Design a protein with these regions (language model features):
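Phosphopantetheine-dependent thiolation modules in NRPS/PKS and related acyl-activating systems
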Residues: 2-81
Length: 81
């Protein structure tokens, strides 16, 4: 799966979780940029991403992330094995 495909899939997950069809994420997007991105939304995002890509995050990996770009890089690494 290419970086673009990963981004497109994560974009759709964000739209589903936040129930906002026009939401646009960039590598620099973080929790402060999306009004409803709270701890519950983070859990929903994490579960949806893990399910979509067939991967598992550990707590340390998640707490180290600062923005969507870092999340996309982590997903790419996990998919690659």
């Amino acid at each position: 799966m290419t970086k673009v495909e990963i981004h497109e899939n994560v974009q759709e997950i964000f739209r589903d979780v936040f129930d906002e069809e026009d939401i646009v994420i960039t590598d620099k997007t973080n929790a402060e940029d999306i009004e409803d991105w709270d701890s519950l939304a983070q859990v929903r995002l994490t579960v949806a991403i893990e399910k979509k890509f067939g991967i598992k995050f550990d707590f340390g990996e998640l707490t180290a992330l600062h923005n969507v770009g870092e999340m996309l890089e982590l997903i790419e690494k996990k998919i690659a094995g």
